[in-house]
Amino acid sequence: MAKKSKIAKNEQRREIVARYAARRAELKEVLRRPSSTEAERLAAQRELRRQPRDASPTRVRNRDQIDGRPRGYLRVFGLSRVNLREQAHAGHLPGVRKSSW
């Protein structure tokens, strides 16, 4: 089980990312657009640097929905490998069965 403070901090980061997402996309579009001038690019870079670090989606960590485990995360289920196995054996994941060949 992950510390509650780590889980809370990650949720706070998700909120910050959502709050700044539209503005970050606009600034990145200015940087990507070939028609933008050098001054526009520099201004966009400067504004991106002024934003909080936690506004970057890279800082958000995928965590298990049950216990917050950060490693061994499977996106399809939103669970770590440990909890995926437990849930599958208990029959709580429809359509998931133990492999045999």
Curated annotation (Swiss-Prot):
A single GO molecular function, which one? structural constituent of ribosome
In terms of Gene3D superfamilies, this protein maps to:
1.10.287.1480
Where along the chain is composition biased (Basic and acidic residues)?
Answer: 38-53
Q: Which GO terms describe its biological process?
A: translation
Gene Ontology CC, one term:
small ribosomal subunit
Q: Mind telling me which Pfam families this protein's record contains?
A: Ribosomal_S14
Keywords from the named record: Ribonucleoprotein, Ribosomal protein, RNA-binding, rRNA-binding
Which InterPro entries does this chain map to?
A: Ribosomal_uS14, Ribosomal_uS14_bac/plastid
Q: Where is this region: Disordered?
A: 31-67
The task this protein performs is described as:
Binds 16S rRNA, required for the assembly of 30S particles and may also be responsible for determining the conformation of the 16S rRNA at the A site.
Q: Which family does it belong to?
A: Belongs to the universal ribosomal protein uS14 family.
Question: What PANTHER family does the record tag this protein with?
Answer: 30S RIBOSOMAL PROTEIN S14, SMALL RIBOSOMAL SUBUNIT PROTEIN US14A
The protein's assembly and partners: Part of the 30S ribosomal subunit. Contacts proteins S3 and S10.
Name of the protein in question: Small ribosomal subunit protein uS14A
The encoding gene:
rpsN
